């Protein structure tokens, strides 16, 4: 009996070990993708943060890139000086981001009624502001400044209560980091930022909320090895489990993740799952300067959705 029990334990341990995803593209790809994502068809993508206060870009621009406009002195700089004054800084918008009418349960119920199967919340965009109490963003998160609420945590609970999958968008780089300022500091000098900030912060987010979907972004100035893509993807899969899935925005050299065409007609030939990402207008975040005709009508939206689903998305 003792020998049989020992044999069973050995077999069980081997099974557990073999189920672990190793930090190699071969192991990650052997793990594959969960069927639920292919079946889901419709998800909700939420861009809501400090950039939602000015909510401004050119008529065709991305409002969530507001901070970048201040860096390059485009028309957002003139807008800010005209409306808020020359001494007003982007950081001054944070206390104005209050979310006083926000009801996560109401949102989740609406998402459920829409037919969506999963929700993606921008946990941190390129401005570095976090919608959870990240220890790596002191004084620059939604619990310490702004609404004083854990947006990631509250929405995750509400969404899962409705039987939907919860996921997070996470920007790999930041415009505001004091360790490495994206688009300002040399791309190759990103090592310390990745090792001491990005990796521990991303692991903090995943460990705390166990998101089923991880959508990274802002990868394009560095490669997959610099972002430690293999290590992070395998760690994420081993941490969250078999329903977890990542996207493909990990830099040059990435070999895994669902494809993410942006404002496109979709993909017809691919060896991976894919999901087009877009706003109802030309911006993901609210752009008060965007004309109404930029927004898709209900008929246009349904027609576009049918085209994407018919193509396999």
Q: What do these predicted ranges mean?
A:
Residues 1-4, 111:
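Positively charged n-region of N-terminal signal peptides that target proteins for export
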Residues 19-313:
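Mature catalytic domains of secreted/periplasmic carbohydrate-active enzymes
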Residues 6-15:
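Bacterial N-terminal signal peptides
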């Amino acid at each position: 009996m003792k020998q049989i029990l020992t044999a069973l334990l050995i077999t069980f341990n081997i099974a557990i070990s073999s189920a672990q995803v190793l930090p190699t593209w071969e192991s990650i790809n052997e793990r594959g993708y969960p069927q639920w994502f292919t079946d889901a068809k419709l998800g909700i993508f939420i861009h809501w943060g400090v950039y939602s206060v000015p909510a401004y870009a050119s008529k065709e621009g991305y409002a969530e890139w507001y901070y970048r406009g201040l860096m390059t002195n485009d028309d957002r700089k003139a807008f800010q000086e005209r409306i808020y004054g020359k001494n007003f800084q982007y950081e001054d918008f944070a206390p104005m981001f209050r979310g006083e009418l926000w009801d996560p349960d109401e949102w989740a119920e609406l998402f459920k009624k829409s037919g969506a199967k999963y929700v993606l919340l921008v946990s941190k965009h390129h401005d570095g502001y976090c919608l959870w109490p990240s220890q790596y963003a002191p004084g620059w998160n939604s619990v310490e400044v702004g609404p004083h609420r854990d947006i990631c945590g509250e929405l995750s609970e509400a969404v899962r209560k409705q039987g939907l999958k919860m996921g997070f968008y996470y920007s790999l780089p930041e415009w505001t980091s004091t360790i490495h300022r994206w688009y300002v500091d040399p791309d190759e000098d990103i090592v310390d930022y990745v090792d001491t900030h990005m990796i521990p912060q991303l692991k903090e987010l995943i460990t705390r909320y166990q998101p089923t979907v991880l959508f990274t972004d802002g990868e394009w100035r560095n490669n997959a090895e610099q972002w430690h893509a293999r290590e992070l993807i395998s760690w994420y899969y081993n941490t969250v489990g078999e329903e977890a899935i990542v996207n493909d925005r990990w830099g040059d050299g990435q070999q895994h993740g669902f494809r993410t065409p942006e404002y496109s007609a979709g993909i017809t030939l691919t060896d991976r799952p894919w999901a087009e990402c877009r706003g109802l207008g030309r911006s993901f975040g609210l752009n008060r300067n965007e004309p109404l005709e930029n927004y898709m009508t209900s008929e246009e939206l349904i027609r576009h959705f049918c085209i994407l689903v018919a193509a396999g998305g």
